A protein has these predicted regions:
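Acceptor/aglycone-binding surface of glycosyltransferases and processive sugar-polymer synthases
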Residues: 54, 59-77, 94-171, 197-222
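Short beta-strand-to-loop acidic/aromatic patch adjacent to the donor-nucleotide binding site
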Residues: 80-89
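Catalytic donor-sugar/metal-binding loop of nucleotide-sugar-dependent glycosyltransferases
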Residues: 145, 166-169, 179-195
Length: 223
C-alpha cells in the first residue's frame, strides 16, 4: 500500500497532540496525518497545524463518531488505499504502525485491530471485564472473532468504507464498523499492541458502557 492516511480525532488534546504527530511522522509523512479537531476549546487546532499535520475543524463538539466520519470522507475523496485511526492522548504507541503494516502485507482487505494484551496491572479490572463482554457480543454480531473491540487503534481498508453505510454518531460508530465489516465479508484481523494507560482519571463508566453496548446489540438488528 502506497497511500495511507492517519486519522486522529481530537478533543482538547493540546497537551499531547504535538508529541503524537512527531512520533507518527517517523512512520507516516506529516502530509498524510489528518487531525480532526472536534470543537476543542484549547489550542489543539493551532498546535496540530504547527506540528505539520493537516487539520480539519468541527466548530462544535459532535462526538468521536462524527470526527471519524469526517476523516473517512477525506480519505475517500483523496483516494487513500487505507487509513489508520489513532487516539490523540498517546495511549496508542505510534511505533506499532510498523506491525500493522507488516500484517497488512499478508493479503489485507478489511480491518486490522490493535489488540492489547491481558495485563490487569495496567488495565483496570472493570474495563477489562467490559471489554471482554462487548468483544464477545460483537464477535457474534459480526460473525468473526474480535479480540479487543474497544481498541480504537485500527488499520482500515477504504474498500470497507465504500461498501458499508455508517449511521452512528458517537463512540458506537467504532462498533458499528466492526459489525458491518464482518457481515459484508471483509476480514477482521488483529495485531498485538502495548497496553498503555495514562495516570489521568478515566471518563469511562463500565456499567454505562455495558448498557450502551446492549443497546448497540439491539440496534444492530436493523443495521
Amino acid at each position: 500500500m502506497n497511500r495511507i492516511l492517519v486519522i486522529v480525532p481530537a478533543y482538547n488534546a493540546g497537551l499531547t497532540i504535538s508529541e503524537l504527530i512527531q512520533k507518527v511522522s517517523k512512520f507516516i509523512d506529516k502530509t498524510n496525518i489528518l487531525v480532526i479537531d472536534d470543537g476543542s476549546q484549547d489550542q489543539t487546532f493551532t498546535l496540530a497545524q504547527k506540528a505539520g499535520a493537516v487539520v480539519l475543524k468541527h466548530e462544535t463538539n459532535k462526538g468521536k463518531g462524527e470526527a471519524l466520519k469526517t476523516g473517512f470522507k477525506y480519505a475517500q475523496k483523496k483516494n487513500y488505499e487505507a487509513l489508520f485511526t489513532i487516539d490523540a492522548d498517546l495511549q496508542h504507541d505510534p511505533s506499532s504502525i510498523r506491525d500493522f503494516l507488516q500484517k497488512a502485507n499478508q493479503n489485507f482487505s478489511g480491518i486490522i485491530i490493535g489488540t492489547r494484551g491481558i495485563n490487569l496491572k495496567k488495565m483496570p479490572l472493570a474495563r477489562w471485564l467490559t471489554n471482554n463482554l462487548t468483544s464477545a457480543i460483537l464477535s457474534i454480531l459480526s460473525g468473526q472473532r474480535i479480540r479487543d473491540s474497544q481498541s480504537g487503534y485500527r488499520l482500515i481498508s477504504t474498500c470497507v468504507l465504500k461498501r458499508i453505510k455508517l449511521k452512528a454518531k458517537k463512540y458506537d460508530l467504532e462498533s458499528e464498523i466492526l459489525v458491518k465489516t464482518g457481515r459484508s465479508g471483509f476480514k477482521i484481523d488483529s495485531v498485538p499492541i502495548p497496553t498503555i494507560y495514562q495516570e489521568s482519571k478515566s471518563f469511562i463508566n463500565p456499567f454505562v458502557d455495558t448498557g450502551r453496548f446492549i443497546r448497540i446489540m439491539l440496534r444492530s438488528i436493523w443495521w
